[in-house]
């Protein structure tokens, strides 16, 4: 199945030497990741910051970003396109295992017996904004369906995403480096 969603457009602003604002880039993301074993799954890495407060004039280095985690004390913005999940549970597990091994080696992906194969933990606070379609957020004890316009705040929990809708879906994620220490 091909991706039926329109391409993501990334527009970046800047100030010139006189302080006048302009568009420094306008086009597709410079960092797009896909996994052959999961057709239609596309990660559009948009931007990242490496400090807080963020350095406004920091270089655009998103093309060097690897994994799921933001930089220490930083953030990462990505837009992910999700194909419908395959009906066969073994095929879904195969696809998700490939996704984690190729793209997200830094995610806590230590599955327990009976868990959804996409379960993972990150030490982050994530803002997940459903842009298109319908996705289901799965936790250890419950799940909920999210539609376009819904926002989920993920706070370091064991969780997974599944697309049971039969149609492509798109979510924007802002991951903020976090700590479980009080």
State each model region's role.
Residues 1-65:
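N-terminal leader/capping segments at the start of a protein or of a new domain
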Residues 4, 9-11, 15-16, 20-24, ...:
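Double-stranded beta-helix
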Residues 28-30, 78-122, 156-158:
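Conserved short histidine dyad/triad with adjacent acidic residue
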Residues 45, 51-68, 76-82, 89-92, ...:
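Terminal, intrinsically disordered low-complexity segments enriched in charged/polar
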Residues 72-75, 83, 143-147, 156-180:
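Ligand-binding loop in jelly-roll beta-barrel domains
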Residues 114-148:
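A short beta-strand-loop-beta hairpin characteristic of the jelly-roll/cupin
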């Amino acid at each position: 199945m091909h991706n039926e969603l329109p391409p993501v457009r990334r527009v970046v602003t800047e100030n010139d030497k006189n302080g006048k604002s302009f568009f420094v880039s306008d086009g597709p993301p410079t960092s797009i990741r896909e996994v052959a074993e999961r057709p239609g799954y596309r990660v559009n890495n948009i931007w990242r910051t490496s400090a807080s407060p963020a350095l406004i004039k920091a270089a655009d280095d998103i093309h060097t970003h690897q994994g799921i985690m933001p930089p220490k004390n930083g953030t990462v913005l990505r837009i992910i396109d999700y194909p419908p999940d395959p009906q066969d549970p073994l095929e879904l597990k195969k696809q998700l295992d490939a996704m984690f091994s190729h793209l997200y080696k830094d995610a806590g992906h230590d599955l327990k017996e009976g868990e959804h194969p996409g379960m993972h933990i990150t030490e982050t606070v994530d803002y997940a904004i459903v842009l298109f379609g319908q996705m289901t957020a799965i936790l250890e004890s419950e799940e909920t369906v999210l539609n376009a316009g819904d926002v989920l705040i993920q706070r370091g929990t064991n969780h997974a995403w599944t697309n049971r809708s039969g149609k492509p879906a798109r979510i924007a994620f802002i991951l903020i480096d976090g700590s479980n220490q009080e």
